[in-house]
Each structure stands twice: as C-alpha cells, then as structure tokens.
Amino acid sequence: MTPLRPTRPCPECGKPSTREAYPFCSPRCKNIDLNRWLSGSYVIAGKPLGEEDENDS
C-alpha cells in the first residue's frame, strides 16, 4: 500500500515521521514542540499588542 504522504524527518530529532504523530516521529517529540510554543520559546514576529497602525483607525 502506498503511504498517504511522504515520510519526512521529525523536526525535533530527525527520525522518520509516523502517521500517528505527523510531522513528528512520536507523541514525545510532538509534546516537546507543543511545550516550546506554550512556554514562549517559539514566537511569530509581529507588532506588540496595543500598537495600532495609523491607517487601522
């Protein structure tokens, strides 16, 4: 049977990803990544809250 999507390396450890935890290799790596988002280790760049552009009003 052909896989639904290609196997890619886990972004945390580099092992091949699994279908159950895609794009990660395991629930452990998935939880490590989630913890990094929740703790603020990962951020998406943007304006700080409260700053409005003059054109937004």
UniProtKB/Swiss-Prot annotation:
GO biological process: regulation of DNA-templated transcription
Binding-site residues, Zn(2+): 10, 13, 25, 29
InterPro entries: DNA_gyrase_inhibitor_YacG, Znf_NHR/GATA
Family, as annotated: Belongs to the DNA gyrase inhibitor YacG family.
Function (record text): Inhibits all the catalytic activities of DNA gyrase by preventing its interaction with DNA. Acts by binding directly to the C-terminal domain of GyrB, which probably disrupts DNA binding by the gyrase.
Species the sequence originates in: Brucella melitensis biotype 1 (strain ATCC 23456 / CCUG 17765 / NCTC 10094 / 16M)
A Pfam family that the UniProt record links to this protein: YacG
Required cofactor(s): Zn(2+)
Keyword terms of this UniProt record: Metal-binding, Zinc
MF annotations from Gene Ontology: DNA topoisomerase type II (double strand cut, ATP-hydrolyzing) inhibitor activity; zinc ion binding
Cofactor note: Binds 1 zinc ion.
Disulfide bond residue pairs: none
UniProt cross-references to Gene3D superfamilies, sorted A to Z: Erythroid Transcription Factor GATA-1, subunit A (3.30.50.10)
Subunit structure: Interacts with GyrB.
Protein name (database record): DNA gyrase inhibitor YacG
